[in-house]
A protein has these predicted regions:
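Structural signature of hydrophobic alpha-helical transmembrane segments
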Residues: 78-88
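Core segments of transmembrane alpha-helices
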Residues: 13, 55-69
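Interfacial loop-to-transmembrane junctions
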Residues: 93-116
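Cytosolic, membrane-interface loops and tails of multi-pass inner-membrane proteins
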Residues: 22-52
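Transmembrane helix-loop junctions in multipass membrane proteins, especially transporters and channels
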Residues: 22-30, 76, 104, 127
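Hydrophobic residues within alpha-helical transmembrane segments
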Residues: 9-12, 86-90, 109, 116
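Juxtamembrane boundary at the C-terminal end of a transmembrane helix
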Residues: 121-128
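Long, highly hydrophobic alpha-helical transmembrane signal-anchor segments
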Residues: 1-20
Length: 128
């Protein structure tokens, strides 16, 4: 049930990608837990990239989760679905790393790959 582990890990990435954001906020003097979004709007450089990567992780998760659920319902146990889920997780980890390291072109390519993986998972009923 590796596909479920990928879904769980993708959900955990919603929290993991917040860690560098919180670190960047802390570096400004203190983490403002009363109004963290206002503090986040002030981030620049690494902090701004970390925030953008975190926000995109939140945006990418629902499409991936829907794709996994569609594939599990329509093609239970299909090896291609599991392979695609693993690829998604690896691509998103690479995307996150590229965003933090400011490697824009590769980051964009990885974003596109992750998006295509999610769409492919959702489209599986069309050929399975």
């Amino acid at each position: 049930m590796l596909i479920y582990a990928c879904l769980l890990f993708a959900a955990l990435m919603l929290v993991l990608t917040k860690v560098p954001v919180a670190w960047a906020q802390q570096r400004t003097g203190r983490y403002d837990n009363h109004d963290p979004r206002a503090q986040q709007r002030e981030l620049t450089g690494f902090g701004a990239r970390a925030l953008a990567a975190h926000q995109n992780t939140i945006e990418a998760f629902p499409l991936f989760a829907a794709g996994v659920l569609v594939s599990v319902i329509t093609a239970p146990g299909a090896p291609i679905a599991t392979t695609l889920a693993v690829i998604f997780v690896l691509v998103r980890l690479g995307y996150w790393g590229c965003y933090l390291a400011n490697i824009a072109t590769l980051r964009s390519l990885l974003w596109g790959a992750g998006y295509l993986v999610s769409l492919t998972l959702m489209a599986m009923p069309l050929w399975m």
